[in-house]
C-alpha cells in the first residue's frame, strides 16, 4: 500500500465479511452532524469506535483502513468499498486495481450536485470495465450502490468520492453515515496538511479512555452522555483557524463547568511567556501576552492544576487586567501535548455561576475534554503558526521589494528600513545606526531625516547596547531595559519616555561584516520581544544589509560618475574650440588640394613635411576632394569644430600625437585617390575609414595595452575585460567629441546611417590593435587568394581592417630618412614606457629596455613579420599598390645595412638611441651615398 504522493489516494477494493466492531485507534477529530443526534442506540458504540478510528488517521494508508472499517461498522451488508481521491485538478484515482473513476452518468450527477446518491447499480458505460463490474445495474433488490462525493466547502470542489455496495439504510444508519462522511473529510484534510508539512512525529495512540468518577463507574449512562457530548464537540472542530476552534472548546467548557468565562493561555515555544487571543465568546482584537512567571509558570513546570487560592497577588492582578473583572474563583489546568509530553497551554475557568468553587469534577471535565481535543488543537495551532510564517515570508519579500526600490538615496532607504522594521515587529520606536569607522552614526529617525550634521547622533562603536551589538555582531534581546547594565537611562529621565524592552540586531553585508545596527524599542502587544521577533529580525537584517551595502556602493558609483563628468567637462572646456579658431580656419574657404602641394595625392609625398598649423585645413581639403562634404551635406562650421577638437584631443608623446593621426589620414586619402576604393567599398565605409584614421589614437598616453593592464590603470579597469584597452578608449573619446555641442558631423544622418557609421568606426579603430590583425591574417590571405568579392560583407569588413592597418603603418612606406626618424620617435616612446616599468619593479620587454634593445634588428624583425606581409596583401588585392611594398622592402634593406655596419663597428655607447643621432652614410638604392641625420629636415626627401 504505502503513502500516495500529492493528493492521490491509493485504495483497495475488498469483499468484506459481516460487520464487526472496530478497535479504538489513536486520536480523533469530529465534525458536527447537521441534525441533533438521536437517542442512544445499540450501535452507538460501533459508531463511536469508527469515528475514533478516523480521528487517529495521520497518513494515507491509515485513512483507507479507517474508511473501510467505519463503513463496515455503520452500514448493513457492505460488500465492496472503493475510495478515490483527487489527483491533480480533476482526476479521481484508485489503486487496487489501478484505475480512474469516469465522471459520467450517476457519478457525474453526484459530483455536480455534491450530494450523496443511491441507485440500483451504475450504467455499464459509466464504469471503466472489469474493476467495477460488480456495481453494474441491475443489482439485487435489497442492495444498492452509494456514490458519496466528499465536498470541501472551503475549496468549493469535491476532494474525494467513495463508492459502496451495501444494503438499504435505516434512519439510524443514515444518520451514522452522515457522521462518517464528515469525519472522513476532516481526516483527509488533516492527512493533506501533514503531507504538506513533511514528516513529523506521529501522535501517540490513545490507550484507554480516562477513568471516570465513581458515579460514572456505577453505570454506563453518565459515561455515554459525556462521551456523546464530547463526540458532538469533536464534530465541530474542523476549523483551520485556531481562534474559531478555541471559541468552540471554551463554550463547551463554560457549559460543562458552569464558569462565567474560560480562556486558553498558550505557552510560547521558549516557555518564557503566555499569550491569549480568545476569552469566553470573544476574540480579542490584539493578542495579549505576559511573562510566564509565578504560579502559572509553576503549573507549566509541575504539570499540576491550581486554583485561585494558589495564585500570588501579581498573578491575580495580571489575570484581572486581562479579563476586565474581579476574580472570585479560578481553575487552571495544564494542557499537555501527546506528541511532546510538554505543556502547550493552560486551560482556565473563572467565576462559577453559582458562586461556588471549582471542584475535582470540573477539573476532570477539562482534562476529559482536552484528552480528545488537544491533538487537533495543537495541530491547528501549528498550522496557523506556519500560515503566520508564510505571511511573514511574504511580508519580508514585499519589504525586500520596497527596500530595493530606494537604493538611489541612503537616507530614504534608512527611513524605509525603520518603517518596515517597526511594522514587522510591532515596536514603538526604531533607530538605525551606520558604522562610520569607529563611530555609530544615526541621522534618520522615526520623525524623518536630519539634514544638519550638528543634530545627528554619533556614539563610539564600542559603547552602549548598539556598540555591543556592533562589536560582537550578535543580536541582543533585552526584556527589561532598566535592569541591563549597558542601558543608559539618562535620556529617559530627561525626556519622560520609558524604555521597557529592546531588541537590537546587527546589519551585515555580503562578507558578514557589520555595517550598521538597528534598535527596536518597546514591544507594543507583548511584554517583550519574543524568539519569533528575533528570527524575524535576523531575516530582515539580511535584506537590510544587502540593500544598504548596494545603496552605499550606488552612492560611490554616482559620485565617481559625477567626478568623471566634471573631469570630462573640464577636459572639453580646455579642448573647446573658440569661435575665432574655426572662423579663422574657414575665413578664406576650404583650400583645394592642389594648392597644398603638387604631389599631395602621390604615394611619395611625406605628410610630416607639412607644418602642423596647416594640417587642419589639409583635412578639410581632403574631405572636400573626396566629395564627402557635399554627399553627406556636412555643415562646414561643424566640420571645422570637429577637426580642431580632434586635433586638441591628442596628447604630445614622441610618436602617437596629432601628426601621426594626420599622416594616417593622409595615407587613407592616398588609397582613395590611387587605388580607386569606390570600386571596392561603399561611400559610407570609405568616409568611416577616413574619420577613424583621424580619431584612431585619440588621447594616447605613450604606453601600450600591456602596460595599462600591468599598471592597473583606470583604462584597464574600464576596458581590460573586453581586450584592446587603448583602442576602446580611443573610440570612446571619438564618441565624446561627436557628442560635444557643435561637433557632431553626422547630425544630419538618418538613424540607420548614424548607427552604421558608429559601428564602422568602432570596428575600424579596434582593428588598429596588431593583436587583432594577427588574428585575422589568415582570413586576409584567403581573401587575397580567392579574390575580393564586393558582394561579400565579410570581405568588406576584412578589407577595411587591412586598409586601416596599412594606413597606421604608412610611415614605413616613405623614404629612408622618414623611416629612420619615425623609428627614433617610436623608440623614445618605448624606452619611456620601459623606464616606467622598471620603476614599478617589472622587467620590460627587450624592445622597450634602452639598455638592451638593438634597434636595427628590432626594425628588421618588424618589417619582415608585420609590415611587409601587410603591404604584400595590399599589392595582391590592388596591383597599383606595388610601389608601397617595394618601398617597405627597400627600407628593410637599409636597416640590414645599418645593422651590418654597427655589428662591425659597435654601437657608440650603451644608449640604444645614440647611433640615430650620429652622422653616417649608407649606400642608397641607386648607389649614391646620402647623409643620414635624425634631426635633418624631412623636406630634403
From Swiss-Prot:
Q: How is its activity regulated?
A: The 3',5'-cyclic-AMP phosphodiesterase activity is stimulated by 3',5'-cyclic GMP.
For this record, an example GO cellular component is: plasma membrane
Residues reported to bind Zn(2+) = 660, 696-697, 808
What is known to happen upon mutating residue 907 to A? Answer: Decreased 3',5'-cyclic-AMP phosphodiesterase activity. Loss of 3',5'-cyclic-GMP phosphodiesterase activity
Q: Which GO terms describe its biological process?
A: adenylate cyclase-inhibiting G protein-coupled receptor signaling pathway; aorta development; cAMP-mediated signaling; cellular response to 2,3,7,8-tetrachlorodibenzodioxine; cellular response to cAMP; cellular response to cGMP; cellular response to granulocyte macrophage colony-stimulating factor stimulus; cellular response to macrophage colony-stimulating factor stimulus
Q: Where is the GAF domain?
A: 241-377, 409-548
Give this protein's Gene Ontology molecular function annotations: 3',5'-cGMP-stimulated cyclic-nucleotide phosphodiesterase activity; 3',5'-cyclic-AMP phosphodiesterase activity; 3',5'-cyclic-GMP phosphodiesterase activity; cAMP binding; cGMP binding; identical protein binding; magnesium ion binding; phosphate ion binding
Q: What is the effect of changing residue 812 to P?
A: Loss of 3',5'-cyclic-AMP phosphodiesterase activity. Loss of 3',5'-cyclic-GMP phosphodiesterase activity
The record's remark on the cofactor is: Binds 2 divalent metal cations per subunit. Site 1 may preferentially bind zinc ions. Binds 2 divalent metal cations per subunit. Site 2 has a preference for magnesium ions.
**Catalyzed reaction equations:** a nucleoside 3',5'-cyclic phosphate + H2O = a nucleoside 5'-phosphate + H(+); 3',5'-cyclic GMP + H2O = GMP + H(+); 3',5'-cyclic AMP + H2O = AMP + H(+)
Q: What's the effect of swapping residue 811 to A? A: Decreased 3',5'-cyclic-AMP phosphodiesterase activity. No effect on 3',5'-cyclic-GMP phosphodiesterase activity
Q: Where is the lipid attached (S-palmitoyl cysteine)?
A: 5, 11
- Assembly and interaction partners: Homodimer.
Q: What family does the entry list?
A: Belongs to the cyclic nucleotide phosphodiesterase family. PDE2 subfamily.
Q: What is this protein called?
A: cGMP-dependent 3',5'-cyclic phosphodiesterase
Organism, scientific name = Homo sapiens (Human)
What's the name of its gene? PDE2A
Amino acid at each position: 500500500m504505502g503513502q500516495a504522493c500529492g493528493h492521490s489516494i491509493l485504495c483497495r477494493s475488498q469483499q468484506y465479511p459481516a460487520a464487526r466492531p472496530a478497535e479504538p485507534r489513536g486520536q480523533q477529530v469530529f465534525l458536527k452532524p447537521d441534525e441533533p443526534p438521536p437517542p442512544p442506540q445499540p450501535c452507538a458504540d460501533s459508531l463511536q469506535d469508527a469515528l475514533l478510528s478516523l480521528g487517529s488517521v495521520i497518513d494515507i494508508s491509515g485513512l483507507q483502513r479507517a474508511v473501510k472499517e467505519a463503513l463496515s461498522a455503520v452500514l448493513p451488508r457492505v460488500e465492496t468499498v472503493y475510495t478515490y481521491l483527487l489527483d491533480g485538478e480533476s482526476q479521481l484515482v484508485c489503486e487496487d486495481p489501478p484505475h480512474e473513476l469516469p465522471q459520467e452518468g450517476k457519478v457525474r450527477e453526484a459530483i455536480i450536485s455534491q450530494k450523496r446518491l443511491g441507485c440500483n447499480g451504475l450504467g455499464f458505460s459509466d464504469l471503466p470495465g472489469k474493476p467495477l463490474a460488480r456495481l453494474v445495474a441491475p443489482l439485487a433488490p435489497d442492495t444498492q450502490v452509494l456514490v458519496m462525493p466528499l465536498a470541501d466547502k472551503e475549496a468549493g470542489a469535491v476532494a474525494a468520492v467513495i463508492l459502496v455496495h451495501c444494503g438499504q439504510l435505516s434512519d439510524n444508519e443514515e444518520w451514522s453515515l452522515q457522521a462518517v462522511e464528515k469525519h472522513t473529510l476532516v481526516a483527509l484534510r488533516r492527512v493533506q496538511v501533514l503531507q504538506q508539512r513533511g514528516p513529523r512525529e506521529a501522535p501517540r495512540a490513545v490507550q484507554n479512555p480516562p477513568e471516570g468518577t465513581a458515579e460514572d463507574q456505577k453505570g454506563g449512562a453518565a459515561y455515554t452522555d459525556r462521551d456523546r457530548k464530547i463526540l458532538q464537540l469533536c464534530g465541530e472542530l474542523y476549523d483551520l483557524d485556531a481562534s474559531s476552534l478555541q471559541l468552540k472548546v471554551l463554550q463547551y467548557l463554560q457549559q460543562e463547568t458552569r464558569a462565567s468565562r474560560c480562556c486558553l493561555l498558550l505557552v510560547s515555544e521558549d516557555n518564557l511567556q503566555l499569550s491569549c487571543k480568545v476569552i469566553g465568546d470573544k476574540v480579542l482584537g490584539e493578542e495579549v501576552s505576559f511573562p510566564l512567571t509565578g504560579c502559572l509558570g509553576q503549573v507549566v513546570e509541575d504539570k499540576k492544576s491550581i486554583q485561585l487560592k494558589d495564585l500570588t497577588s501579581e498573578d491575580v492582578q495580571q489575570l484581572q487586567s486581562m479579563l476586565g473583572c474581579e476574580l472570585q474563583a479560578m481553575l487552571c489546568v495544564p494542557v499537555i501535548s501527546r506528541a511532546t509530553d510538554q505543556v502547550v497551554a493552560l486551560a482556565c475557568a473563572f467565576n462559577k455561576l453559582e458562586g461556588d468553587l471549582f471542584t475535582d469534577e470540573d477539573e476532570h471535565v477539562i482534562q476529559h475534554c482536552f484528552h480528545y481535543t488537544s491533538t487537533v488543537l495543537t495541530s491547528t495551532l501549528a498550522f496557523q503558526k506556519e500560515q503566520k510564517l508564510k505571511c511573514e515570508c511574504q511580508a519580508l519579500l514585499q519589504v525586500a521589494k520596497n527596500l530595493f526600490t530606494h537604493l538611489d538615496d541612503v537616507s530614504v532607504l534608512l527611513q524605509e528600513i525603520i518603517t518596515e522594521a517597526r511594522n514587522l515587529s510591532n515596536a514603538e520606536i526604531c533607530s538605525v545606526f551606520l558604522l562610520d569607522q569607529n563611530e555609530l552614526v544615526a541621522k534618520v529617525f522615526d520623525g524623518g531625516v536630519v539634514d544638519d550634521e550638528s543634530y545627528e547622533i554619533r556614539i563610539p562603536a564600542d559603547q552602549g547596547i548598539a556598540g555591543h551589538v556592533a562589536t560582537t555582531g550578535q543580536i541582543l534581546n533585552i526584556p527589561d531595559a532598566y535592569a541591563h547594565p549597558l542601558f543608559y537611562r539618562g535620556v529617559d529621565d530627561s525626556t519622560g519616555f520609558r524604555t521597557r524592552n529592546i531588541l537590537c540586531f546587527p546589519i551585515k553585508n555580503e562578507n558578514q561584516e557589520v555595517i550598521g545596527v538597528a534598535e527596536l524599542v518597546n514591544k507594543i502587544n507583548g511584554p517583550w520581544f519574543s524568539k519569533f521577533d528575533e528570527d524575524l529580525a535576523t531575516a530582515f537584517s539580511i535584506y537590510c544589509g544587502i540593500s544598504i551595502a548596494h545603496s552605499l556602493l550606488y552612492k560611490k558609483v554616482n559620485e565617481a560618475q559625477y567626478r568623471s563628468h566634471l573631469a570630462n567637462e573640464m577636459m572639453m572646456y580646455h579642448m573647446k574650440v573658440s569661435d575665432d579658431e574655426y572662423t579663422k580656419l574657414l575665413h578664406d574657404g576650404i583650400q583645394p588640394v592642389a594648392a597644398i602641394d603638387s604631389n599631395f595625392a602621390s604615394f611619395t609625398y611625406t605628410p610630416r613635411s607639412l607644418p602642423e598649423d596647416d594640417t587642419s585645413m589639409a583635412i578639410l581639403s581632403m574631405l572636400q576632394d573626396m566629395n564627402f562634404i557635399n554627399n553627406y551635406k556636412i555643415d562646414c562650421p561643424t566640420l571645422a569644430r570637429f577637426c580642431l577638437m580632434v586635433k586638441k584631443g591628442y596628447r604630445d608623446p614622441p610618436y602617437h600625437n596629432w601628426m601621426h593621426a594626420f599622416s594616417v589620414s593622409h595615407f587613407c586619402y592616398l588609397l582613395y585617390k590611387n587605388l580607386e576604393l569606390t570600386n571596392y567599398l561603399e561611400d559610407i565605409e570609405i568616409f568611416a575609414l577616413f574619420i577613424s584614421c583621424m580619431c584612431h589614437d585619440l588621447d594616447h598616453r605613450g604606453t601600450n595595452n600591456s602596460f595599462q593592464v600591468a599598471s592597473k590603470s583606470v583604462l584597464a579597469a574600464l576596458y581590460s575585460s573586453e581586450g584592446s584597452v587603448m583602442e576602446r578608449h580611443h573610440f570612446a573619446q571619438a564618441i565624446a567629441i561627436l557628442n560635444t555641442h557643435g561637433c557632431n558631423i553626422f547630425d544630419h544622418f538618418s538613424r540607420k546611417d548614424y548607427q552604421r557609421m558608429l559601428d564602422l568606426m568602432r570596428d575600424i579603430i579596434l582593428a588598429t590593435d596588431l593583436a587583432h590583425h594577427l588574428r585575422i591574417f589568415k582570413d586576409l590571405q584567403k581573401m587575397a587568394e580567392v579574390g575580393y568579392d564586393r558582394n561579400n560583407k565579410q570581405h568588406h569588413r576584412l578589407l577595411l581592417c587591412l586598409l586601416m592597418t596599412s594606413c597606421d603603418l604608412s610611415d614605413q612606406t616613405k623614404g629612408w630618412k622618414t623611416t629612420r626618424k619615425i623609428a627614433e620617435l617610436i623608440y623614445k616612446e618605448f624606452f619611456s614606457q620601459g623606464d616606467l616599468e622598471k620603476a614599478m619593479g617589472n622587467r620590460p620587454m627587450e624592445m622597450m629596455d634602452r639598455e638592451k634593445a638593438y634597434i636595427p634588428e628590432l626594425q628588421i624583425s618588424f618589417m619582415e613579420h608585420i609590415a611587409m606581409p601587410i603591404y604584400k596583401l595590399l599589392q595582391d588585392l590592388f596591383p597599383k599598390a606595388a610601389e608601397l611594398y617595394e618601398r617597405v622592402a627597400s627600407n628593410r634593406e637599409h636597416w640590414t645595412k645599418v645593422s651590418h655596419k654597427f655589428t662591425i663597428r659597435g654601437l657608440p655607447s650603451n644608449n640604444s638611441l645614440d647611433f640615430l643621432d650620429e652622422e653616417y652614410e649608407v649606400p642608397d638604392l641607386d648607389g649614391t651615398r646620402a647623409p643620414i641625420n635624425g634631426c635633418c629636415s624631412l623636406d630634403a626627401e
